[in-house]
Amino acid sequence: MNSFSNDDFDFSFLEEGFSARDIVEQKINEVSLSDDKDAFYVADFGDIVKKHVRWFKALPRVTPFYAVKCNDGKAIVKTLSILGAGFDCASKTEIQLVQSIGVSPERIIYANPCKQVSQIKYAASCGVEKMTFDSEVELMKVARNHPNAKLVLRIATDDSKAVCRLSVKFGATLKTSRLLLERAKELNVDIIGVSFHVGSGCTDPQTYVQAVSDARCVFDMGAELGFNMHLLDIGGGFPGSEDVKLKFEEITSVINPALDKYFPADSGVKIIAEPGRYYVASSFTLAVNIIAKKVMVNEQSGSDDEEDAANDKTLMYYVNDGVYGSFNCILFDHAHVKPVLTKKPKPDEKFYSSSIWGPTCDGLDRIVERFELPELQVGDWMLFENMGAYTVAAASTFNGFQRPTLYYVMSRPHWQLMHDIKEHGILPEVPDLSALHVSCAQESGMELAPAVCTAASINV
């Protein structure tokens, strides 16, 4: 767990003055004369390090337990383990992944309220004790199969203001919570805390206030029954990019006073959260290639002029990744993606109404329904930013189309910052590394050197 190794993943240092976007351009240039223009990702792990620093500035009392389901890349898990994060696992496989790199059981919460018996037994066998539940059936399953479990009661929230709602499936009401606590007492099961999740894409931060208040009620119920509850899990759903209605700090500015009111610092309660997309969404950029194109002329235009008819056309582009691959986020995560062109349009270039489709034989495989684009050609590239969350983790190989290749990069200052965090924790003052996103190459228009990154295999 103490080193990044090329045996684990291809990890490269960015040379000074270059950005992850430059690596995207370099990879495109490398295959420009080849027919093998496969889709690929470039992931900037420096962005993950910056997110970790930002987290503790905004939520200093809350320990992040990364939601592995969001993006289960081993490189991501390893990076976050070095930074000191915990892990929210939802299955035996995720627990195995996290423990395979040396993470201790104490840094894992099995945060799935509905677990298969064999997987409860597996958690018991490998020392994972913290796990969630929200029903009497689950309580009895755990009591029989994991006597040493430290249970966290998942309560329902008002997630009506969230894009991805979860309380329709998970969470106990306050009334049910008391009954579950009483039953746990009868079964001699240890209840150590409360968890909740307000849903992803929450647009009303006051939802957190009500959820924290409800959690306080359950803590008080537990105290009445003799439980020593000392863990509060405020869930996930925090935004991982800036193209959202409610920014991360707008949410945390509401959460912090609620935590101080209901769970003050001297209360003895440890507070954790389950961020997933927060850490990885903005670090991944996906590059796709146009593999086919269709021109649709509006036959109802009423014009006999060929030039007018050509100007009234719409364009359909087919690219080599789709909703059965990385863009499954459109179907399952309510994502709205926008293409970014690798070539800057000319000032007088005409734009056309365009749609973008994936490569499979399914008519459902549409990425963008309508977008104004200049006319592009087969072989041209499009980029999609903020593609790190709920994309590769749920991608399939339907129709035989393979998942995109992943390239991992990080700047040396971010690497050094990660090393410092590992050795000393989050420092009160950390260097401002925001300028590292500015690319000298892009600003100056210079051509990229043959290699703007070097391979890394460095102990930390």
Swiss-Prot record:
Residue pairs linked by disulfide bridges in the UniProt entry? none
**GO CC list:** cytoplasm
Read off the SUPFAM superfamilies from this record.
Alanine racemase C-terminal domain-like, PLP-binding barrel
List every position bearing Phosphoserine. S303
Give the site residues for Stacks against the aromatic ring of pyridoxal phosphate and stabilizes reaction intermediates: H197
Q: Which GO terms describe its biological process?
A: putrescine biosynthetic process from arginine, via ornithine
Which reaction is catalysed here? L-ornithine + H(+) = putrescine + CO2
What is the regulatory mechanism acting on its activity?
Inhibited by antizymes (AZs) in response to polyamine levels. AZs inhibit the assembly of the functional homodimer by binding to ODC monomers and targeting them for ubiquitin-independent proteolytic destruction by the 26S proteasome.
Alphabetical list of CDD domains matching this protein: PLPDE_III_ODC (cd00622)
Query: Which EC number(s) does the record attach to this protein?
Result: 4.1.1.17
Asked if Lyase is a keyword of the record, the answer is yes
Residues bound to substrate are F332, D333, D362
Keywords for this protein: Decarboxylase, Lyase, Phosphoprotein, Polyamine biosynthesis, Pyridoxal phosphate
Pathway assignment reads: Amine and polyamine biosynthesis; putrescine biosynthesis via L-ornithine pathway; putrescine from L-ornithine: step 1/1
Cofactor(s) required for function per UniProt: pyridoxal 5'-phosphate
PANTHER family named in the record:
ARGININE/DIAMINOPIMELATE/ORNITHINE DECARBOXYLASE (PTHR11482), ORNITHINE DECARBOXYLASE (PTHR11482:SF42)
Q: What's this protein's family per the entry?
A: Belongs to the Orn/Lys/Arg decarboxylase class-II family.
Quaternary structure, per UniProt, is: Homodimer. Only the dimer is catalytically active, as the active sites are constructed of residues from both monomers.
Protein name from the UniProt record: Ornithine decarboxylase 1
What organism is listed for this UniProt entry? Answer: Xenopus laevis (African clawed frog)
